[in-house]
Each structure stands twice: as structure tokens, then as C-alpha cells.
Amino acid sequence: MTILQTLTNTNLDEVLQFMIECDLSEFGKADSSREDLEEQWDEMDLSKDGWIARDVQGRLIGYGCVTGEDGRYGTDLYIHNPLSPEGLENELMGKCLERANELAAQDSNIASAHLTGYATSVNQRLQQVFEQNGFDRFTYHYRMQIDFNGPVESPQRPEEFTLSTYQEVDETELFQLIESTFTWEGRDPLSIDAWRNLIFRGGRYDPEYFVLVRSSGRLVGAALSYAEESGGWIRQLAVAKDYQGKGLGSWLLQHMFSVFYKKNLPGVGLGVASSNSKAWHFYERIGMYRSREFIEYRKPLA
């Protein structure tokens, strides 16, 4: 017997531990972040947007939630092999779809809406529940990783460039750089408000890890990163198109490696869409490897 319950803030530690157990089951390494979960829950109506499943002993055996607005909604589903019983993923998916359609119906000013979800390449059960419920495979994403197995030297900065950390006056120029360079197939443009929510984490970021590169005063590169328990995480790395292929991206990435190495972190990771083949080939040349693959699913909402 499975019992579904809505979320409360008191569930956060328990849910995080379950997510980590799912990470370990699939990849042998934790990948879930308390800060990310706190940020996500801050944006949710916990009594309506999320659910946990328990067995008769009271153990947490499943988790699902819905987030988003303005026609763009996302669902997270966590099931654990073999702890989560067969069919639990369908119960959680039913709750998520019902709530996502409610949210879409409330957004009367949007022309269309869709629900996005992700499954790892090794989780057949999640892949099946998405596909059985009318989701299409939209694209694939790679987690790129580098592990620090020895000293990491700081690369010499080219004289042409000046380096600084982010300040509030940089916001519009930084957003324009990101949107002008993130133009690969399948990527939807973001409004500045959506980008701000994605990057600044409700104020939970450290400007030390938001590194900007200028040439003659013009912003030509940026690395927007976070220091997490598992290592450095580069959320966005951008180089102006007329500076690509000239070594700036390589230098900036290696600079971030050295920054996180000096913080005694074990490595650095980032995510990249498989359709952005130029980027992930570049990361591999720098010494990163693909540690995980995710399938992005999408489903139109009524």
C-alpha cells in the first residue's frame, strides 16, 4: 500500500535525502543540492504543487512536483529502484499532469503551454512513464565533468582582456550577451525575468563566481557559476560570437577550474544540450567528459 501526501517545509531534509539515494542508485554519486531544492520550494505552493509517497512503514519511496509559469512548466519525478514499487511513477505523474493543466488553465493570457520533464538515460521506468503519458523526446543533455586529480594552474590572462566580478549594473549587458550567444537548435529564448530567476537563485549566489571578461570596455565573455558541496557548477558560459574560436572560451573555462581548485573543491561540472555539438566537443577537448545523459521530454498542455 502506498500513501500520497502533499508537501510541507518539514519534508525538505527527507526529500533531499531520498533524491540523493536516487542519485547514488543510478550513478553511484550524489548530484542533488539542498540550495537548489530550497530555491525550487520557495517558488512552489507546497500544498498544491508537490507530493511524497510513503509505504506502510512510513518510509519515503517517491517524490514529484510541478513548477513554472507563463506557459512553461516543469515536472520532477523521483523513484528509486528497487525501493519504489512498480506503478508509483504513474500515480505521481497523474498528480503532476493534473496540477500542470490547472496552472495552464489559470494562465489565460498565454497562447500555448507545455510541460517539460527529464529522465536519465539509465532510468527506464521514468522514460516509460513519460512516453506512456504522451510526452515526446525533445532533446538530450549531457553533464560534462572534470575531476581534479592533481594541481590546477591558473592560466595566463591575455593582455587584451580585463577580468571583473558581477555587479548589478552589469545585468542588462550580461543578459544580452547570454541571449545573443545561446542560439542553438531547440533552445527557447528567455525573458530577462525568467533568466534572472534562473541565475540569481533568489539572491543565493556569490558574485565571486560570476566572472566577466571585457575587451576595450565591451563585455565579451562570462562564466556564471556556483560553489556547491559536490564541486563547482558552471550554470552559463558565454563568449561573444565574434570572439569564438580565438581561445577566450578555453581560457575562461580553465580560469574557472583554477578558481574552484583553490577553493578545495573536487572538480567542476556543467550541463550542455546535445544539439549544441560545438559546445560539448569543445568541453571534451578541454579535458571534460560526459558523466551523465538526460532525456528532455515535452508534452503540450490543454
Predicted ranges, named:
Residues 85-102, 239, 245-262, 281-285:
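Conserved acetyl-CoA-binding loop-helix of GNAT-fold acetyltransferases
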Residues 67-74, 79-159, 295-299:
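Acyl-donor-binding surface of acyltransferase catalytic domains
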Residues 142-164, 266, 271-277, 287-302:
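C-terminal "cap" of GNAT-fold acetyltransferases
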Residues 20-40, 182-198, 206:
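Conserved GNAT-fold acetyl-CoA-binding loop/helix
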Residues 75, 115-117, 234, 268-272:
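Conserved hydrophobic beta-strand within the GNAT/NAT acetyltransferase core sheet
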Residues 2-15, 162-176:
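A short beta-loop-alpha structural element at the N-terminal edge
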Residues 126-130, 283, 288:
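Conserved active-site tyrosine of GNAT-family acetyltransferases
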Residues 20-103, 119, 215, 219-232, ...:
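Conserved donor-binding loop and adjoining core beta-sheet/short helix segment
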